[in-house]
């Protein structure tokens, strides 16, 4: 079993604090909305409306908020009449419009939002009373006199509102500490801990009756528990939702502000009341919980067991746990029932349970019994108890609480330079703003200087998850693998292949979870929670070029159905990857009862899309599920294309197994598809498959298996897949959702199919994962000519997935998930251990801006500078995004010291000194959504590093000369200079900056270039002569070509393929080592053909919407900056054993994206499986 990655964070503790100006802005922001404050609504019990539209039952809803002033709930501000009144109004308004009681959940959700926003208004008014009394009722704790930020202690503000004032609660005249300042030069978490303890001590001192100094180690502060969820509506039963039941408990938290963990533990064990604590504290101040009765403690323990299950389940689904602790089980001072005692131990050992399976207390108890038997039998756990080499079953004494020690620790290694000519103009420019962006070039003669003055003050923040940028037409696009052209078989340099599984698989999912903001997408400048909500939004419409790209879509758009027209235009264009044309005839929209089959089909699809766009909300995967239904209906039509019988779509039988079926059923009812059957549950279980076989006794038109457990692996899951695919015999069109695991069992599945059957893999743009596919099988159709077979069947489509998913060790896997400080981040990069990307901040006095720019310019050439005043002194805040290339190029690590190359900061200092004073603020940065080409280029240097590392391992020479052809400013220098015997030389006439870890090759007449009129040996000989090493053997020389080298040859003559092929032949014969970056492997033998078959992407969208692609009528579709190497070059590579391909898999590219701060945009996710199949790098064997 794969080891679950655990990444311990302090975010729970950091959420207890808020910057003063941000908190005040939230309190006085009257335009705050439920969604802007990250509000969440959960419907526990659905409201009930009778046939007359009268509200019979209110139901129950739970409301919660993200970090901030609303995160902790005030029960005294809650009013059930607000919810009742809002729900009555929503039901009355909704009933007038639809008269459909099935919409009651949406009415209930709308009422909850209205109620929540009324509650938010009351919270703001309560906090206003607190901040208006800051000066005379509360104290401000100052930790430093230097540059600092002022922060509120949110729990202190919460206590002030809950008890009206803290002074009333404690009978004192002072309200205690409510905030303070934290130094910008010291670690933030340590200062937060000091400030939190100071607040608790202020409460303790107010409650002391004696003046003598107490023993501070034993001081304790008792506070009532805080609430994070607010419930409205009807009461739930005593064995109902367990979160609801625990929320109703009133217990206390005992804090030890000056004590240690052992002191707290001893006090908890001696407490006369039922009590418990966590083994790992999310707030680093010792504390435990005290309950009124044993039953309350037991209920809270069951909640801990349940929360651990859910956390583990999500961890395996998402690749890891990013939290303050792994286990939520409590250590208690009471003897517990045997089943609970054993569950506190067993809950940590298996894969967890989904939230829906353990909603109620009864569910938790039932699952606990089953899991105890599961663990005791030794099945399905990640650990083994060994005695003398023999595995033993787990033995737990009833009534004894056992702590899993050290489980929380997890695995150990789980631009242009502008010279200012007018100083006065620079100052005038600065006076117009309080912040500015400056560029810091490297000095002409760089020397290495130490950066220790500001290393301790430097702060690092990880990027926040970012939304995926996409467009309307990308969501409805798809393609079939077999229709995307054929690529010649490659020769890989590294033949160590591993299927993506185990720990690497978990980490890849974990990387996506950290970098991507859930399933949020950004469309046309607006951020939406899901792609489903995005395309349903009234202001999200397709581009006109899409609508008018097909005549039938233009006709539909004229009727006002803009979204439907745009979606159908994309869908019908994508069907051309199957080589079919099913456009309806002219005038099809005006036919009331169409008789022509293509018109009838188009009318049906239009009604489905209309029902989907008008559907209120829906899950994140709903749009993808709708696309699967539409695609399956089209395939069913194609299967019967040559059959004379009439097709009646209202009699179409479609069985949907797995997630999304209930929502689809509501949509398809609107179009009279009454024979759609949704079978709820998890398809990835033997019990579910047994149930499916009962449905399979009768032939169905379409069967869809929508799997939702992608983290499962192993022979048991493969057998389950085989059993599932065997059910295809009960369907004419069979579709199975799968992911990268297809590379393990795909060949077996294809071998099960009958002769003449059609099968393919389909990739939908609506899918959130580039490696999620749908396997399609169509049984042999009646008739002799099915009319939809792909033109090219020479290569099995499984090879597409293997090339893009199987593991090739071309990227270093030295990945670290632990959180480190700013200096640790820089040291990790310099030792080629990569982590999650982020940004750096530094505050420097106004008279020392030069040294600050020196350090920050070594991390990124572009520096954001703002000016503020602190304690009457002028400061500058410098912030930069992490640039891995820049750090490796301009910094080095010597012993314990960090050294940076000297930069030219004079011009930037002049601009910064002219800034006016503004408010101090922190820029919140997210992972950047980039196109496929930027994402792929971000991987290349990682590949170069690993290849260079292998070269050095096999090299026996005293020195190696690296010539980077087209290296611009030597961004690659830090990646290849891994040893003192490596010397880097840049050959490029366009570079502007000096290279600290190398030098440029300069000729008497200027900078050296690669002369395409000369041979490889002649060019190399000229370089060696210039650098003074003419006797260097070829074995000691490395040539690294940028992706512009082939373009340079092509520029000499149109389609200059022969010269390019000649270059590759020379490189094959030459004795040195060669690396060629980012080349394009053509699809066809004819160099003039498209690199991807004409059906994609040129016909998927109009040329103007093919993002990042040039449309050349002579050469076909070429991606920008990636020239076509020509078939001749590929033939040379395949014919000779010296040059080979280096291709990285999708999950390895995630490492690079996370290290650079990139996430792939919507079009990139659509095209990525094909893109990384064609764009490769070439190199000689190390």
Swiss-Prot record:
GO (cellular component) term, any one: host cell membrane
Under the heading InterPro entries, the entry gives: VP3-like
Mark the transmembrane ranges: 618-638
Q: What is its main location?
A: host cell
How would you describe this protein's topology in the membrane?
Single-pass membrane protein
* Localization in the cell: Host membrane
Q: Name one Pfam family in it.
A: VP3-like
Coiled-coil residue windows: none
Q: Which key words are in the record?
A: Host membrane, Membrane, Transmembrane, Transmembrane helix
- The answer to whether the entry has keyword Transport is no
- Signal peptide feature range: none
How is this protein named in the record? Uncharacterized protein VP3
Look up and give the organism this protein is from.
Colorado tick fever virus (strain USA/Florio N-7180)
């Amino acid at each position: 079993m794969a080891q679950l990655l655990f990444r311990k964070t302090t975010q729970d503790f950091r959420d207890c604090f808020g910057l003063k100006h941000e908190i005040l802005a939230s309190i006085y922001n009257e335009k705050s909305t439920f969604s802007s404050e990250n509000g969440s609504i959960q419907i526990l019990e659905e409201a009930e409306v009778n046939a007359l539209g009268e509200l019979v039952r209110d139901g129950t809803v739970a409301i919660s908020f993200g970090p901030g002033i609303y995160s902790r709930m005030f029960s005294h501000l809650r009013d059930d009449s607000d919810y009742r009144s809002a729900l009555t109004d929503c039901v009355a308004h909704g009933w007038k419009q639809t008269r459909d009681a099935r919409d009651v959940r949406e009415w209930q959700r709308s009422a909850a939002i209205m109620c929540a926003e009324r509650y938010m208004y009351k919270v703001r008014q309560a906090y206003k009373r607190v901040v208006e009394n800051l000066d005379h009722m509360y104290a401000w704790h100052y930790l430093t006199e230097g540059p600092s930020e002022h922060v509120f202690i949110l729990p202190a503000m919460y206590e002030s509102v809950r008890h009206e004032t803290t002074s009333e609660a404690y009978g004192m005249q002072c309200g205690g500490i409510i905030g303070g300042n934290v130094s910008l030069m010291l670690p933030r978490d340590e200062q937060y801990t000091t400030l939190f303890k100071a607040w608790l001590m202020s409460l303790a001192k107010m409650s002391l009756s004696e003046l003598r100094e107490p023993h501070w180690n034993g001081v304790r502060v008792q506070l009532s528990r805080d609430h994070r969820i607010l419930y409205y509506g009807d009461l739930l039963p005593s064995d109902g939702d367990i979160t609801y039941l625990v929320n109703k408990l009133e217990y206390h938290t005992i804090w030890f502000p000056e004590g240690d963990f052992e002191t707290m533990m001893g006090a908890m064990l001696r407490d006369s009341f039922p009590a418990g604590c966590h083994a790992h504290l999310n707030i680093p101040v010792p504390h435990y919980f005290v309950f009124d009765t044993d039953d309350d403690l037991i209920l809270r323990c069951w909640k801990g067991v349940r929360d651990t299950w859910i956390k583990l389940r999500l961890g395996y689904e998402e690749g890891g746990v990013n939290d303050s602790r792994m286990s939520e089980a409590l250590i208690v001072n009471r003897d517990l029932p045997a089943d609970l005692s054993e569950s506190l131990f067993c809950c940590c050992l298996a894969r967890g349970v989904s939230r829906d399976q353990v909603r109620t207390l009864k569910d938790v108890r039932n699952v606990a019994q089953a899991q105890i038997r599961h663990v005791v039998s030794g099945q399905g756990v990640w650990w083994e108890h060994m005695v003398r080499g023999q595995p033993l079953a787990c033995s737990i004494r009833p009534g004894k609480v056992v702590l899993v020690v050290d489980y929380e620790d997890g695995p150990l290694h789980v631009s242009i330079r502008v010279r200012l000519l007018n100083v006065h103009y620079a100052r005038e420019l600065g006076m117009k703003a309080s912040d500015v962006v400056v560029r810091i070039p490297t000095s002409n003669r760089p020397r290495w200087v130490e950066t220790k003055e500001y290393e301790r003050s430097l702060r690092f923040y990880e990027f926040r998850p970012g939304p995926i940028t996409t467009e309307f037409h990308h969501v409805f696009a798809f393609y079939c693998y077999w229709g995307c052209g054929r690529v010649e078989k490659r020769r890989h340099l590294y033949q160590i292949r591993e299927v993506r599984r185990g720990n690497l698989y978990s980490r890849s999912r974990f990387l996506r979870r950290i970098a991507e903001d859930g399933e949020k997408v950004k469309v046309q400048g607006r951020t939406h929670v899901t792609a489903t909500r995005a395309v349903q939004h009234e202001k999200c419409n397709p581009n006109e070029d899409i609508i008018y790209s097909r005549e039938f879509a233009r006709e539909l758009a004229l009727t006002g159905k803009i979204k439907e027209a745009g979606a159908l235009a994309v869908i019908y264009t994508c069907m051309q990857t199957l080589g079919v044309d099913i456009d309806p005839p002219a005038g099809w929209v005006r036919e009331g009862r169409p008789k022509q089959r293509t018109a009838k089909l188009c009318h049906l699809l239009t009604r489905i899309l209309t029902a989907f766009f008008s559907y209120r909300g829906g899950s994140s995967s709903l749009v993808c599920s709708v696309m699967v239904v539409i695609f399956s209906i089209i395939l069913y039509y194609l299967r019967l294309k040559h059959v004379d019988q009439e097709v009646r779509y209202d009699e179409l039988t479609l069985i949907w197994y797995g997630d999304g079926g209930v929502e689809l059923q509501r949509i398809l009812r609107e179009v009279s598809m009454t024979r759609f059957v949704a079978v709820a549950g998890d398809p990835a279980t033997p019990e579910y498959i047994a149930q499916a076989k009962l449905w399979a006794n009768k032939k169905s038109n379409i069967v869809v298996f929508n799997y939702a457990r992608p983290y499962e692996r192993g022979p048991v899951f493969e057998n389950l897949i085989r059993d599932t695919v065997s059910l295809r015999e009960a369907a004419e069109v069979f579709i199975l959702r799968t992911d990268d695991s297809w590379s393990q069992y795909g060949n077996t599945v294809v071998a099960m199919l009958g002769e003449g059957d059609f099968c393919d893999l389909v990739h939908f743009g609506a899918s959130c994962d580039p490696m999620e596919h749908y396997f399609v099988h169509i049984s042999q159709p009646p008739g002799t000519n099915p009319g939809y077979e792909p033109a090219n069947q020479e290569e099995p489509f499984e090879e597409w997935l293997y090339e893009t998913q199987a593991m090739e060790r071309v990227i270093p896997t030295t990945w670290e998930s632990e959180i480190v400080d700013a200096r640790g981040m820089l040291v990790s990069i310099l030792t080629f251990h990569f982590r999650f990307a982020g940004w750096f901040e530094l505050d420097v006095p106004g008279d020392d801006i030069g040294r600050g720019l020196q350090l920050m310019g070594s991390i990124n050439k572009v520096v954001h500078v703002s000016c503020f005043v602190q304690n009457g002194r002028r400061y500058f805040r410098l912030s930069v995004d992490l640039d891995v290339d820049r750090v490796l190029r301009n910094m080095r690590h010597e012993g314990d010291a960090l050294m940076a190359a000297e930069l030219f900061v004079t011009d930037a200092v002049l601009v910064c000194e002219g800034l006016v004073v503004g408010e101090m603020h922190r820029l919140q940065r997210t992972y950047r959504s980039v196109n496929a080409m930027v994402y792929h280029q971000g991987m290349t240097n990682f590949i170069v590093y690993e290849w260079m590392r292998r070269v050095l391992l096999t090299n026996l020479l005293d020195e190696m000369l690296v010539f980077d052809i087209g290296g611009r400013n030597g961004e690659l220098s830090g990646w290849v200079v891994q040893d003192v015997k490596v010397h880097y030389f840049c050959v490029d006439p366009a570079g502007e900056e000096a290279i600290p870890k190398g030098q440029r090759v300069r000729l008497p007449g200027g900078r050296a270039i690669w002369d395409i009129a000369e041979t490889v040996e002649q060019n190399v000989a000229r370089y060696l002569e210039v650098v003074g090493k003419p006797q260097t053997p070829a074995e000691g020389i490395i040539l690294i070509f940028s992706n512009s080298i082939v373009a340079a040859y092509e520029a000499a003559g149109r389609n200059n393929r022969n010269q390019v092929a000649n270059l590759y032949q020379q490189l094959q014969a030459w004795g040195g080592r060669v690396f060629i970056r980012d080349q394009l492997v053509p699809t066809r033998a004819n160099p003039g053909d498209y690199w991807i078959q004409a059906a994609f992407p040129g016909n998927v969208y109009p040329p103007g919407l093919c993002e990042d692609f040039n449309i050349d009528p002579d050469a076909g579709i070429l991606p920008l900056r990636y020239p076509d190497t020509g078939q001749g070059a590929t033939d040379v590579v395949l014919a000779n054993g010296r040059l080979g391909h280096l291709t990285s898999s999708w999950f390895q590219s995630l490492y690079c994206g996370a290290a650079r701060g990139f996430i792939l945009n919507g079009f990139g996710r659509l095209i990525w499986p094909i893109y990384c199949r064609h764009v490769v790098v070439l190199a000689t064997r190390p």
